[in-house]
Amino acid sequence: MRVYVDGEPVDVPEEATVRDALEAAGVSVPEDVTIAVFKGEQKVERETDRLRIMLETGDEELSLTVAVEDERMSEVCEELPGASVSWTTRDEVGLGPVDVSDLEFHTRRGVEVPPYTAILILPTNDPSEAYFLITKRRMAVEYICTDIHGRVTAGRELVDELRGGERVTHVEPVVERATERVVSRVTLDDGLEAGDRIITRVEIELEKNAPVSAEHLLNTLEMEEGRLRIKFRTDTFTSIEPRPFYDLPEENVDMRERGVVTVRNRGVDEGVVYVYRRDRTPVESHNVVGRVRRGMELLDVVAEGDRVLVETDPPRVNFVGLTVDEARELAEEFDVELEVNGDGDVVVDQEPRETLNVLKERKVRVEVVPEDEVIEIELYEDDAPRSVEYFRRVTKMLDRPVGRLKVHFAYADLGMIVFEGNEKLGKKLPPENNPKDRVEAGVLGVTNQAKPHAGLIGVRLEDSEEYGPTGETFEGTNVIGRVVEGLGRLREMDQSDMGRTVYVREVRGER
């Protein structure tokens, strides 16, 4: 029988499993990622987030449709049958009263509200005497119940025709008739039927007008070995657990249609990646970085904590951390002119930094240093996540495998070398992954907020049962990693090296 793997046809026996089909297609996937199978389409009826409010006026029946943006607004609308239009002005229409004694809410005064917004107001501060208000123009509203609102999406012209006394007869959900794609999660050992379409990954085409945000997405993928972990899922979007990133610019603000990928550029969720499942209007806090070209159905069935394979077009073009020979091969692969500055073997910086800008300019300038000037380190991100994030931020390694440290002081006779940190950020570092009995030579650590010199970064040059890499006692020390290669080079440094730049390159592997 014939099935399809990521769009490609594959012939397999009748009793074949998902695993058999993947092997026949030459496709391998990690055991911990989610896979789906698309079975076809079916006609369905489903409720939407909109409610139809029916009003009676004489022999005529009027209909208004409100898109509900909060569950409590649905509960308010359920109380409307029997209520009447109590007043109309050139600015607003009020229906009620309605009893909302069972709802939790807060009230504010003088809140600016757009036209044709449905809100709840509490003019007497008595929840049994609340009113459902529809605005006709932008206006400041008094005694508004915050976070209980909706939008009039149909029947706006009728709002202006209401004169008072019209009665709400009933409220009903708006039902959509749609064609629904039948998709289900599967395991590698599940059986298949003829025509099944196996989806193993999501393919994203990057937008050329969001190079910085796209690089953040590419870095997140690279650090997670091509997999993204689902953080949150709603009917509107699926969000991805991000790598930390700061100071994202506003770029390529556009419509958030189904399949659009965005990165939040501000706020507490800065850096979070979103894939939209339903259309939404543009918002300045979201940069559109790409569009799902294949595999959107997989994101319709994932759950929080799932991992999905993701590929991008184009893939990341990052030279930092490569040898000069590797950099030349990469430049040739993508038809990019390579300009090498400096004497050495290891690329420690590149300009432009962003993949999309490199491909746009078809030229990249890289800075190289001798390999023996680059210290290789392993970071313990799982054991000390906040401290490792701090280290990457200080060294500018949030999106690159190579960073820079400046020597603060080097005393071989004291058994440590200390590098400059960021005192302001360091004061926010809580104790985590403190040493227990001893600190071995090569251990990398930072001073936490328990000590005056919070934020200093250090490497232990010899074992100690008393002091950490920055010379602090164990309660003031957060262990963040170890030196894998180059400890001898650090031992050669002394006070004449104060202020010198030391390059560090992260290697990932088993401890």
Swiss-Prot record:
- Classification via PROSITE patterns: PASTA (PS51178)
Source organism's superkingdom?
Archaea
Which family, according to the similarity comment? Belongs to the UPF0288 family.
Mind telling me which NCBIfam families this protein's record contains? methan_mark_3 (TIGR03268)
Family matches, as SUPFAM superfamilies:
Cyclophilin-like (SSF50891), Penicillin-binding protein 2x (pbp-2x), c-terminal domain (SSF54184)
Q: What is this protein called?
A: UPF0288 protein MK0796
Q: Mind telling me which InterPro entries this protein's record contains?
A: Cyclophilin-like_dom_sf, Methan_mark_3, PASTA_dom
